[in-house]
Curated annotation (Swiss-Prot):
Record key words, sorted: Metal-binding, Ribonucleoprotein, Ribosomal protein, RNA-binding, rRNA-binding, Zinc
Name of the protein described by the UniProt record: Large ribosomal subunit protein bL31
Function: Binds the 23S rRNA.
Cofactor binding summary note: Binds 1 zinc ion per subunit.
Family membership noted in the UniProt record: Belongs to the bacterial ribosomal protein bL31 family. Type A subfamily.
Description of how the protein assembles with itself and partners: Part of the 50S ribosomal subunit.
Species: Pseudoalteromonas atlantica (strain T6c / ATCC BAA-1087)
Amino acid sequence: MKTGIHPDYQDMKATCSCGNVIVVRSTLKKDLNLDVCSACHPFYTGKQRNVDTGGRVDKFNKRFSALSTKK
């Protein structure tokens, strides 16, 4: 490998909107602002909300059940 052609690899702070600070190594020269991180994302915190699609499935089956009985 050639020497002196690669950018500097240094510590960088990624700051989330919840206040969590993550230190990572990168060639990016400025700090990074995040909207969500593993500390505040609903999937990781267990506050995930399941959307009930049962009504949509029943509506679809009701609409197209007439087509399957005609055959």
